[in-house]
UniProtKB/Swiss-Prot annotation:
Membrane topology: Multi-pass membrane protein
Organism: Parasynechococcus marenigrum (strain WH8102)
Record-given protein name: Photosystem II D2 protein
The encoding gene: psbD1
Other known facts: 2 of the reaction center chlorophylls (ChlD1 and ChlD2) are entirely coordinated by water.
Binding annotation for a plastoquinone: 213, 260
UniProt KW NADP keyword: no
Amino acid sequence: MTIAVGRAPQRGWFDILDDWLKRDRFVFVGWSGILLFPTAYLAIGGWLTGTTFVTSWYTHGIASSYLEGCNFLTAAVSTPADAMGHSLLLLWGPEAQGDFVRWCQLGGLWAFVALHGAFALIGFMLRQFEIARLVGIRPYNAIAFSGPIAVFVSVFLMYPLGQSSWFFAPSFGVAAIFRFLLFLQGFHNWTLNPFHMMGVAGILGGALLCAIHGATVENTLFEDGEQANTFKAFEPTQEEETYSMVTANRFWSQIFGIAFSNKRWLHFFMLFVPVMGLWTSSIGIIGLALNLRAYDFVSQEIRAAEDPEFETFYTKNILLNEGLRAWMAPADQPHENFVFPEEVLPRGNAL
């Protein structure tokens, strides 16, 4: 009698590493974690370091750190000096030559945070793809997260790449982002851009859908518990529905005359609206990077210039944009030494 004993298959280093990365632990690592965790750690650490210690005196002529007296709303990691162009500003590059202090003064931390932040966001999206595949569900979470990634990449990377340097990107700070919004309005008339309009419709529409959906579900919960708190009547593993889709459909049919009767369409619509808003606004920002114009009603501008009594909300906004450009440019770009004589500063038609 012959007994054959099978030899266990050889496990290579890749299989061992794959098992370790995908092990069930409190914080899942996975292959995406190799990209996500180091880049997110460095991006957040760089931002905390910059807002705490690093000045923007050499790049923007302003104070931007807690050390200089800023608070959480006014501190920022500022963009590099305009003279740096689109350099990656590597610490060991020709600009800083390994000098960490000089690297910080030139704005190297901004490039560091922006690039590591972009890769961290991509790593987080890949993490959602990876876990969805392991759990056996569809990857719509990752697809939805492509919206914020598109906005980050278009605003912080694509826009300054279309301009003369990284200097014109937003700095990483609350007040700094507000300044960038004013800049986009003054120099690009961004609020009148159709892609901005689609973005606003998507984001605010998504918020409205979220509020309506949450309220409707709360309105139509089944009375399936004796407790005073209705939340205690729900069990995550229960098989039966927790709210009545039929009742919700009847309610909104009476309100609007039309309502979703399919939960799958309803939730896809709630996914589609805000994500499309993010995507379209990202496309618009790329248009601004190329200095494309949208909705310039020149005929109204010409008539307003010829007729002091003719003015529209559009022409008033154009004057405001001129004011933003004239008063913002000297303060925002001190290295250019802009000086505007009084006669070229914008004045209303009635003045």
